[in-house]
UniProtKB/Swiss-Prot annotation:
UniProt KW keywords: Calvin cycle, Carbon dioxide fixation, Chloroplast, Disulfide bond, Lyase, Magnesium, Metal-binding, Methylation, Monooxygenase, Oxidoreductase, Photorespiration, Photosynthesis, Plastid
InterPro entries: RuBisCO (IPR033966), RuBisCo_large_chain_AS (IPR020878), RuBisCO_lsu_C (IPR000685), RuBisCO_lsu_C_sf (IPR036376), RuBisCO_lsu_fd_N (IPR017443), RuBisCO_lsu_N_sf (IPR036422), RuBisCO_lsuI (IPR020888)
UniProt catalytic activity: 2 (2R)-3-phosphoglycerate + 2 H(+) = D-ribulose 1,5-bisphosphate + CO2 + H2O; D-ribulose 1,5-bisphosphate + O2 = 2-phosphoglycolate + (2R)-3-phosphoglycerate + 2 H(+)
Organism classification: Eukaryota, Viridiplantae, Streptophyta, Embryophyta, Tracheophyta
Compartment(s) of residence: Plastid, Chloroplast
CDD domains: RuBisCO_large_I
GO BP: photorespiration; reductive pentose-phosphate cycle
Major location category of this protein: plastid
Organism: Anthocleista grandiflora
Cofactor binding, per record: Binds 1 Mg(2+) ion per subunit.
Official protein name in the record: Ribulose bisphosphate carboxylase large chain
Cofactor(s) this protein requires: Mg(2+)
N6-carboxylysine carried by residues: 192
Keyword Translocase annotated: no
């Protein structure tokens, strides 16, 4: 019959289209779908496509006022997950017209909005997105990128060294500044506000900024190296955040920091635009990420949060360590590290990358390895992350038995030894401990660090692991 027909019909009749050929301009998504018992995988995949695009639970007469074929999401493929019962990877294509240009906020509101509470699904996880080049070109991306940062700092050929100041809460502004100065003069490139430090009663933000600036200028003058401190500009409102960034620029500080998930993508993108316009580097902390990404069958993988950050804008982002105290398998971590740094990444399921991604010269982001690392980890970190990284030792600097500056010296000596050994052709993975021992003969600071942390390990199985590849 002609006209509107009320009622409920199966999603798969409209949104499951295995014959669909994807377009270069489509946003492609890979969802890990766990249907409720009795729900066919095709219906579950189609439901995801519908609820994250144009669909609702019943037929509505206003469907006739638009072209659903033009705007609907389509589930174009489903494959079972090897080794899992009743779990599937559903591939969904979204037309580009569904998304506002230059808005990570709108992209995520559409793709991972209501659908994650859908009753027909027991669990749902977004594993990867292919962002088309046409959409990427609507984003500014990182304020500066890797090469511009190296040029600003005049530091080449090695990873950069950082340190989060501890205790993270409770220090006065002056004592915090003193700790910053000690670390920077000892040989670190950066120090960092803890992500929880904003403007609390024990240390208001303006005092914090002033004492950090004093520490940076004093520490730069002694060795003649450019230094930085990640001043956390995160605040309760966007206006307050921008006020703090403006003050950092007025003080001549080279880098500010933002907690991009708790602060939100809209605030982050605004800050990234300001940083590019005003010559500030932008360090990004990922506080709250594990709430979203740690469970294997529900939520969103961190590689998506990393891609979104590259689009929204940030020059550094925390990316796990592989060897420290925080979650992260080596292959998975290297997969999203490449997505952050490289211009073109081929799909590679052995590293969790579902789609080939072309960034069309969007600047890269430097991954930051931070969390439970110390001098014995330096060879592995240098080998895993390479030169374009920040290796950040908080307790691994401040916990040195002789104090902050000797802790910084120990880390710098260990790093320089590893870089020299690598450049001479030595195998860091096989000879790492020997390289550190040799260097410690010439550095009493490194020898003391080696002694105190020789037995420290964080040996726990990762929650988020790769699926077995199909034979």
């Amino acid at each position: 019959s002609v006209g509107f027909k009320a009622g409920v019909k199966e999603y798969k009749l409209t949104y499951y289209t295995p014959e669909y050929e994807t377009k270069d301009t489509d946003i492609l998504a890979a969802f890990r779908v766990t249907p409720q018992p009795g729900v066919p995988p095709e219906e579950a995949g189609a439901a995801v496509a519908a609820e994250s695009s144009t669909g609702t639970w019943t037929t509505v007469w206003t469907d006739g006022l638009t072209s659903l074929d033009r705007y609907k999401g389509r589930c174009y493929g489903i494959e079972p997950v090897p080794g899992e019962e009743n779990q599937y990877i559903a591939y969904v294509a979204y037309p580009l017209d569904l998304f506002e240009e230059g808005s990570v906020t709108n992209m995520f509101t559409s793709i991972v909005g209501n659908v994650f509470g859908f009753k027909a699904l027991r669990a749902l996880r977004l594993e990867d997105l292919r962002i088309p080049t046409a959409y990427i070109k609507t984003f500014q991306g990182p304020p500066h990128g890797i090469q511009v940062e190296r040029d600003k700092l005049n530091k080449y050929g090695r990873p950069l060294l950082g340190c989060t100041i501890k205790p993270k809460l409770g220090l006065s502004a002056k004592n915090y500044g003193r700790a910053v100065y000690e670390c920077l003069r000892g040989g670190l490139d950066f120090t960092k506000d803890d992500e929880t430090v904003t403007s609390q009663p024990f240390m208001r933000w303006r005092d914090r900024f002033l004492f950090r600036a004093e520490a940076i200028y004093k520490a730069q003058a002694e060795p003649g190296e450019i230094k930085g401190h990640y001043l956390n500009a995160t605040a309760g409102t966007c206006e307050e955040m921008m006020k703090r960034a403006v003050f950092a620029r007025e003080l001549g500080i080279p880098i500010v920091m933002h907690d991009y998930l708790t602060g939100g993508f809209t605030a982050n993108t605004s800050l990234a635009h300001y940083c590019r316009d005003n010559g500030l580097l932008l360090h990004i902390h990922r506080a709250m990420h594990a709430v979203i990404d740690r469970q294997k069958n529900h939520g969103m993988h961190f590689r998506l949060l990393a891609k979104a950050l590259r689009m929204s804008g940030g020059d550094h982002i925390h990316a796990g360590t592989v060897v420290g105290k925080l979650e992260g398998e080596r292959d998975i971590t290297l997969g999203f590290v490449d997505l952050l740094r490289d211009d073109f990444i081929e799909n590679d399921r052995s590293r969790g990358i579902y789609f080939t991604q072309d960034w069309v010269s969007l600047p890269g982001v430097i991954p930051v390895a931070s969390g439970g690392i110390h001098v014995w980890h330096m060879p592995a970190l240098t080998e895993i992350f390479g030169d374009d990284s920040v290796l950040q030792f908080g307790g691994g600097t401040l916990g040195h038995p002789w104090g902050n500056a000797p802790g910084a010296v120990a880390n710098r000596v260990a790093l320089e030894a590893c870089v020299q050994a690598r450049n001479e052709g030595r195998d860091l993975a096989a000879e790492g401990n020997e390289i550190i021992r040799e260097a410690s003969k010439w550095s009493p600071e490194l020898a003391a660090a080696c002694e105190i942390w020789k037995e420290i390990r964080f040996n726990f199985a990762a929650m988020d692991t790769l699926d077995p590849l199909k034979s």
